[in-house]
């Protein structure tokens, strides 16, 4: 009975994770196919999760994360020191630069935006919070893996992720060179390979023992980035250092929960 209950819990977590990553409602049949589980079991489990408020269904029976997961998320962020300390820093960075700022981390074998403060622009130039992205496509990827050896980095990144959005392939050797070069400054920037419009800036946020635990980022139009590169870089590094100091203060008090 305990083993069956554990399998059910594993599948419930898998369903929540699938819906969060898909960023769209899904029918139970599609969920079953995606996680490779029997349809009957998934239908039964989804009904239970809906009754508990973990999932909600629209008029067509499409499922999406329930409001209880929203409340859990708010509670998590309230107690998550990195996110709690980062929000005012993001607000200040965007207010000072006029550009979209982000807090980014590694999630499994991908990069993701954890928090974002969007700039007041007529059109959106940034990605979605929580969307998994291949690490080599990102400026942050050159900073977030610096604590790993070359062998560990290449074992972590799926080989297909070195293929860029435009079809060209970034050599693993070149990626490692860029990563090690960025280490001394704790900063990296480049024109985003995901589109022809944006330039991405990333600065390391360090935690205990100086390890990079996250990155603070700016996303700006390429022309704006070229014209203001030095100023944007300086502001980003300053705010990343400020966030690192805030985290160090929490560590010193012995209360960091993340």
Predicted segment positions?
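Amphipathic alpha-helical regulatory segments at dimerization interfaces
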Residues: 18, 34, 85-96, 102, ...
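Extended hydrophobic
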Residues: 168-242, 249
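Short, structured helix-loop boundary elements
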Residues: 5-9, 66, 79, 83, ...
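N-terminal helix-turn-helix
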Residues: 1-79, 83, 241-249
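A structural signal for short hydrophobic beta-strand segments in well-ordered beta-sheet cores
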Residues: 55-56, 103-104, 205
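Amphipathic alpha-helical effector-binding/dimerization core
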Residues: 61-159
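Cysteine/selenocysteine-centered motifs that mediate thiol-based redox chemistry or coordinate metal-sulfur cofactors
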Residues: 155-160, 164, 240-258
């Amino acid at each position: 009975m305990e083993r069956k209950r554990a399998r059910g819990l594993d599948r419930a977590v898998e369903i929540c994770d699938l819906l969060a990553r898909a960023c769209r409602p899904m029918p139970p049949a599609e969920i079953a196919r995606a996680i490779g589980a029997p349809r009957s079991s998934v239908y039964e489990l989804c009904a239970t999760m809906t009754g508990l408020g973990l999932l909600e269904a629209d008029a067509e029976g499409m499922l999406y994360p329930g409001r209880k997961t929203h409340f859990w998320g708010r509670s998590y962020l309230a107690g998550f020191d990195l996110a709690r300390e980062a929000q005012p820093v993001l607000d200040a960075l965007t207010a000072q630069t006029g550009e979209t700022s982000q807090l980014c981390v590694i999630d499994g074998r991908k990069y993701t935006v954890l928090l974002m403060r969007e700039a007041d622009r007529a059109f959106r130039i940034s990605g979605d919070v929580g969307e998994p992205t291949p690490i080599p496509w990102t400026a942050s990827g050159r900073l977030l893996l610096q604590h790993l050896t070359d062998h560990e980095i290449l074992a972590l990144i799926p080989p297909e992720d070195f293929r860029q959005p435009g079809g060209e392939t970034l050599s693993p050797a070149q990626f490692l060179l860029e990563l090690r070069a960025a280490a001394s400054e704790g900063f990296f920037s480049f024109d985003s390979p995901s589109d022809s419009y944006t330039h991405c800036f990333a600065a390391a946020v360090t935690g205990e023992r100086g390890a990079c635990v996250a990155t603070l980022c700016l996303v700006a139009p390429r022309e704006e980035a070229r014209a203001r590169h030095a100023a944007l870089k300086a502001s980003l590094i300053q705010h990343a250092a400020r966030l690192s100091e805030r985290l160090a203060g929490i560590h010193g008090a012995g209360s960091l929960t993340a």
